[in-house]
């Protein structure tokens, strides 16, 4: 395809690992408009000097693109304040940004049903959660509650495996981990020793 034919760039999140190529993309796609939350607009200006060709999308707003409908869900502080998720209504794919993500080299496959060591990726998802998302456990639970009414067949995070065979598994894991950080805790002591 010719990038000049692109109409939109969806920015679910403004961290540079998600947006570092935006100026180049705008140059090669001169008709394209950026779709993002209102909170992302100042980031675009400060990080990249981009102040034009931006459309702020509202929480729950839909956009018909050909035979596809995109729906945008604001999920603030599921890592950063401007974060949103995008839902492909027809294919039931949730582009979840940093939520439901994981670490781990993909070893030649992208989907949960293709991999031979799913437990490894679940552990890598826990490592990712604890390092990237855990501080934002309450917003994670809020996002899960907000999205509870949509029919998700595939979860496509920005990092890690795409979950198409059992998307409910990664949702359940993230729910459990978020509840660890926000619910009742066990009293305990950790002893660290090094020599």
Residue spans of the language-model regions?
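Glycine-rich phosphate/diphosphate-binding loops that line cofactor/substrate pockets in enzymes
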Residues: 1-4, 146-151, 180-186
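Redox- and metal-dependent alpha/beta enzyme cores, enriched for Fe-S-associated oxidoreductases
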Residues: 193-195
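Short, hinge-like loop/turn segments at secondary-structure boundaries
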Residues: 51-55, 113, 174
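Active-site neighborhood of phospho(di)ester-bond hydrolases with catalytic His/Asp-centered motifs
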Residues: 6-14, 35-37, 94-97, 155-159
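Metallo-beta-lactamase
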Residues: 31, 35-157, 162-165
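Active-site metal-binding motif and surrounding structural segment of the metallo-beta-lactamase
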Residues: 1-34
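Terminal amphipathic helices with adjacent charged low-complexity linkers/tails
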Residues: 154-186
């Amino acid at each position: 395809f010719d990038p000049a034919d692109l109409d939109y760039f969806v920015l679910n999140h403004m961290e540079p690992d998600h947006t570092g190529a935006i100026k180049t993309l705008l140059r090669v796609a001169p008709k394209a408009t950026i779709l993002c939350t209102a909170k992302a607009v100042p980031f675009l200006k400060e990080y990249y000097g981009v102040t034009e060709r931006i459309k702020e999308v509202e929480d729950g707003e839909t956009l018909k693109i050909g035979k596809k409908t995109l729906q945008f869900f604001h999920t603030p502080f599921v890592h950063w304040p401007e974060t949103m998720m995008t839902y492909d209504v027809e294919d039931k794919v949730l582009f979840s940004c940093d939520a439901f993500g994981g670490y781990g080299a993909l070893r030649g496959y992208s989907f949960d049903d293709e991999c031979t060591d799913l437990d490894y990726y679940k552990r890598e998802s826990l490592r990712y959660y604890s390092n990237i998302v855990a501080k934002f456990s309450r917003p994670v639970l809020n996002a899960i509650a907000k999205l509870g009414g949509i029919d998700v067949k595939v979860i496509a995070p920005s990092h890690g495996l795409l979950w198409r065979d059992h998307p409910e598994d990664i949702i359940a894991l993230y729910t459990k981990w978020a509840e660890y950080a926000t619910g009742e805790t066990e009293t305990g002591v950790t002893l660290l020793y090094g020599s």
